[in-house]
Each structure stands twice: as structure tokens, then as C-alpha cells.
Amino acid sequence: MRRINSLYGRIGLLKRVPEKSTKQAHTFLASLSFSTEGAYGGDGEFQQNSSKVKIFDRDLKRIHRDRAAWLSRQKNDSFVDAVADNLLDRLEDCKKSFPTAFCLGGSLGAVKRLLRGRGGIEKLIMMDTSYDMIKSCRDAQDDSLDNSIETSYFVGDEEFLPVKESSVDLIISSLGLHWTNDLPGSMIQCKLALKPDGLFLAAILGGETLKELRIACTLAHMEREGGISPRLSPLAQVRDAGNLLTRAGFSLPGVDVDEYVVKYKRAMDLIEHLRAMGETNALLERNKILNRETAVATAAIYDSMFATEDGTIPATFQVIYMTGWREHSSHPQAKRRGSATVSFTDLQKQFGGQS
């Protein structure tokens, strides 16, 4: 578990990339985007399925991202940076290079700023549903950035990736994919967009995120309104992450979890931080009106139940890190069932065990 006490430290602006690089990104864009309204069939193809359930309001989430671009301008978020840096650390464990990288939504600026030459990236393509977020990232400048990386930007949707199959070497998504209505479908599209032996890296918020706020909200609603109203969005559980990677068809899947505890002076500071990250509620079936008495009760319950000795209140963020590779002949393959030439009984006898 990691503890982060300070937020919003100032940083320099990001390096502006020439507009001409945007045109070169079209080499990787398909004329028709993949469709997420489908399922992964046994033949390895993405198949149509009209029964997709919509949980999140994607238009509202785009508005949240637009607002976050304005709120987070010229500011450094310690939590967002820690997650992005931890995710990118996995590139240091890879011996190969990834010339073409595709970054999906989430903390675009942090990923770009913290790459620091990792992964041998030569071309970086950055996509977000929010035009304002893309513009903010593109227009920023930072002398610490690697100018040798050719960077392009465009607006797109994680649910309909406008990328050609087998066109990129690396896909990175830091704190972005958990807002998709069809997470398995989005991951399948990511897998198809990768070249053979391409790498998928993602960090999403897990189900234990904001558990303190969930408890406080539930108790406040029961006390003031006599029932429960969904105020926080549902998130994937750790046990689901491995199944998601396997269902998407990734080989050598890997999942690990980290918890970050961020401290705030008051409950309103937590809400402001969530807005600055674009992480506020986007449920389709949400109560759009928050009773003032319920809000005050939530803050009071939060403080009484979870306040620490130093007067701050903690908020837990559970981050699930996922890695997966597109299949390649160089990857280890499981042996066919029944192909073993030595039995466990023989091994036990050989090493002096008792039967």
C-alpha cells in the first residue's frame, strides 16, 4: 500500500509537437473503426452482438474529461503520476523495443512526460475522447521530454478504436479503460491492433477504490432519504482482470494490484480531486440531484469514521495493472495434455519419496 500526502504540485508545460506529425498518424488509422458491440469468437475474429449493456454515459464522461483538462492545467497530480510511472516500469523488464506506441485516454500527459526513453519508442500516438484534453496535452511544453519521439494526437473513442489491425507495437492505457461500457470488447480491439509480439499495458481502478466514500454515501442516504441511490460507479474486481485478458486472447497474461491511500484535509478536497481527474460519477441510471442535507451528512460520516490523528481523511484507490502480449511463435507454449514422458510416481520413487 502506498501513501500519498501531497497533490497538485506544479510542473512545467509539455513540449509542443509540430502539427505535421498529426498527418503521419493516419498511417495507423483504419477507414472503419472496430466495433465493440461484439464478442470474441473461437475463430479469433471479433463478432457482432447487439446485446451490449450500457452502464456509463459516454457523452457525460467526455464532458468530465473536458472539465478535467481545464482543472488540471499546469498541475502535477502525485497519484496519477505514481500510477503512470509504475505502469511504465514494466517496459524496463522488456528486452525488445516498441517503435510505435498507442496511448489510450486516461492520464495522457503523465504517460508522455514519464516515458523517459523507456521502451525504445520512436512514434507515439495519443488518443482521447476529449478534444480539450488532447489540445491541453499537445499545447503543453516541458524541456525534460524526449524530443526524438514523434508524437501525434487525435480524438477517438476507446469503444471504437480507429486503428488498423497489426499496426502498433505497444498500447498503453493508464486510468482510462474502466469507463468503457464494453471493457472486454475494447481489450479485444487492443489485441487486434497490436502487431505479433506486441505488448498491452493497462492500469484501471479496481472495485475497492473509494471504499470509504462508498460507505459514507450509503449510510448518509439511508439516514436522510431512507434508501440507497447509486452515487459511485461500479468498477472491475481483481478476480475479473485475468479473465478479461484471457477472453481478449492475450498470451502470457499478467495481473497485479496496488493500493494508494491519498490524504485530504476535507471531503470536498477529495471531490475536487476526482473532478480534476475526470473520475466523477457517469452512470446512465444515476440520481442527478444530490440533496444538500445528504451531502453534508456524507461529509460528516466520512470524517467521523475515517479521520486520522493528524486531522486528514484518507481515500483508497485500488489500481489493477494488466499486461498481455499478442501471440507470437517465440512465446512459451503449453504442452499438449498427455504428452508427458515421466509420471509423478516415477519422480517420487527417484527422489526417495513414499508412495
Curated annotation (Swiss-Prot):
Gene Ontology CC entries for this record: mitochondrion
Name of one Pfam family that matches: Methyltransf_11
InterPro entries in the record: Malonyl-ACP_OMT, Methyltransf_11, SAM-dependent_MTases_sf
Main EC class the enzyme belongs to: transferase
Primary location recorded for the protein, binned into one broad class: mitochondrion
Keyword Magnesium: no
S-S bonds: none
Keywords: Methyltransferase, Mitochondrion, Transferase, Transit peptide
Transit peptide: 1-34
An individual GO BP term: biosynthetic process
Subcellular location: Mitochondrion
Record-listed E.C. numbers: 2.1.1.-
SUPFAM superfamilies (UniProt xref): S-adenosyl-L-methionine-dependent methyltransferases (SSF53335)
Record carries keyword Lyase: no
Leader sequence residues: none
GO MF annotations in UniProt: S-adenosylmethionine-dependent methyltransferase activity
Family listed: Belongs to the methyltransferase superfamily.
Name of the featured protein: Putative methyltransferase At1g22800, mitochondrial
Organism: Arabidopsis thaliana (Mouse-ear cress)
Lineage of the organism: Eukaryota, Viridiplantae, Streptophyta, Embryophyta, Tracheophyta
